[in-house]
């Protein structure tokens, strides 16, 4: 983005305050240019990496793909259990998807169920299952406990 500025007329020796303030404002605007973010896939530097570094980079980018997550559901307290207890779901799904699934499967009329990861904490509804799986898997399964009322406070 280029700024168009007019040259001052050399024949006029007087300059008023409005012209000075205009040039100062132009300078401030030019100094505050927003940097554009370029995705790594279009980076010229990444294309010129040595072969070994290219292989390492491709491994990292390929690992972030979508995969199936194994989930084991365990009820807490008097909440009924579902059969089967183990399901597979895409890693890009969120916890809210699991919540909706359990509400339908258990036929809960209040549309409210509390989910916990390994009886420890309640995840955010927008948390991705793939991220939770990588952090909290046990025996290659993500254990999700569910309950009708708040179990841990």
UniProtKB/Swiss-Prot annotation:
It comes from the Eukaryota. It is found in: Preautophagosomal structure membrane. The keyword Membrane applies. Keywords: Autophagy, Isopeptide bond, Membrane, Protein transport, Transport, Ubl conjugation pathway. One of its GO terms (cellular component) is autophagosome membrane. The keyword Manganese does not apply. One of its GO terms (biological process) is autophagosome maturation. It is a peripheral membrane protein. Pfam families: APG12. GO terms for molecular function: Atg8-family ligase activity; enzyme activator activity; protein tag activity. Residues 1-26 are annotated as: Disordered. There is a cross-link at residue 153 (Glycyl lysine isopeptide (Gly-Lys) (interchain with K-147 in ATG5)). Ubiquitin-like protein involved in cytoplasm to vacuole transport (Cvt), autophagy vesicles formation, mitophagy, and nucleophagy. Conjugation with ATG5 through a ubiquitin-like conjugating system involving also ATG7 as an E1-like activating enzyme and ATG10 as an E2-like conjugating enzyme, is essential for its function. The ATG12-ATG5 conjugate functions as an E3-like enzyme which is required for lipidation of ATG8 and ATG8 association to the vesicle membranes. Forms a conjugate with ATG5. Belongs to the ATG12 family. This is Ubiquitin-like protein ATG12. The gene is ATG12.
């Amino acid at each position: 983005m280029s700024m168009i500025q007019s040259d001052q007329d050399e024949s006029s020796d007087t300059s008023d305050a409005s012209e000075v303030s205009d040039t100062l404002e132009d300078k401030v605007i030019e100094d505050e240019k927003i940097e554009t973010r370029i995705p790594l896939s279009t980076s010229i530097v990444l294309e010129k990496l040595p072969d070994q570094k290219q292989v390492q980079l491709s491994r990292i980018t390929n690992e972030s793909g979508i995969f199936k997550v194994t989930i084991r559901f365990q009820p807490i307290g008097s909440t009924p259990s579902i059969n089967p207890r183990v399901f597979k779901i895409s890693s890009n799904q969120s916890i809210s998807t699991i919540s909706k699934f359990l509400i339908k499967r258990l036929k809960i009329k209040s549309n409210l169920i509390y989910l916990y990861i390994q009886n420890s904490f309640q995840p955010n509804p927008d948390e991705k299952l793939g991220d939770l799986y990588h952090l909290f898997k046990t025996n290659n399964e993500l254990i999700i406990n569910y309950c009708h009322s708040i179990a841990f406070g």
